[in-house]
Amino acid sequence: MNPRSAGGPRGVVPPGSHEPAKRGGSEGGRPPWLNMRLTVVGSSGSIPGPESPASSYLVQAPFQGRTFTLVVDLGPGSLGALYRYLEPREVDAFALSHLHPDHCLDLCAYYVLARYSPTAPWPRQPVYGPRDTAERLSRAYDVPPLEAKDTDPGPTLAGHFDFHDWQATQQIGPFTVTTVPVDHPVEAYAIRITHNVPGGGSLVYSGDTGPCDALGELSQGADLLLVESSFVEQPGNPPGLHLTGKQAAEVGTRAGVGAVVLTHIPPWHDRDAVLAEALPYFPGPLSLAVTGATWEIG
């Protein structure tokens, strides 16, 4: 972590230990915290890296006497890492920023668990994502995209997941989730998650995007901006694809967010160099996403 990690901003408790949290939260399934919590499951950009799976994040909060868990993206390698924090069947819902493999492909592995594990069949979990998510993931696993018509969910992803196209705003458990399209070669969304309690915190996740006004507008006043920083400052970066650390920090400054966390840095870039490029352009707490790090927001 960089020197600005200490002494959290408004509504954000500084990142906790990078050691994996205990699975299942506290006794009875109730979390030992009251606010929304972000945990980094995987943060490697574009591919899994030697120190981290590809993109995946837990967003959790108390809800109806227990912990509600929203998994945001589930890239390659992240399902295995998820076991460090909870039993996978305890996931309440999934949110997919877009359908590039590094953000969604382990949902196919999750399907294997839901269908074949000793505790199967599992309840159908909601999956929120771009149009045709069910069809695209079904093709990836080479199973029929349509739900089976009998009582056995059978070899279909739609038999095990309840797919929803992203709307501008939706309620998911204790969260209001707002999405906007961002600038990427495929249908892609930035996601704002607000905890529905008095004084509840807000988190914005950029997904993958090049510079665009929509991300800044969605991020206005957020407590924490989890923002991709795939590029370094150099000539020839292609437009409409990714952000540099500097550009990510500038989004946070213009939007007046409380803290910035840089993520989605590919293994071929020096993470510390990306951080160094960003530091001069954001005046508040700024850090790198590290597997196992947590932030309390609210």
Question: Model-predicted segments: where are they?
Answer:
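Cap/insert and terminal regions of metallo-dependent hydrolase folds
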Residues: 211-296
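Binuclear metal-dependent hydrolase catalytic cores
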Residues: 27-205, 210, 215-217, 275-298
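Intrinsic disorder/low-complexity segments enriched in small, polar and charged residues
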Residues: 2-13, 27-28
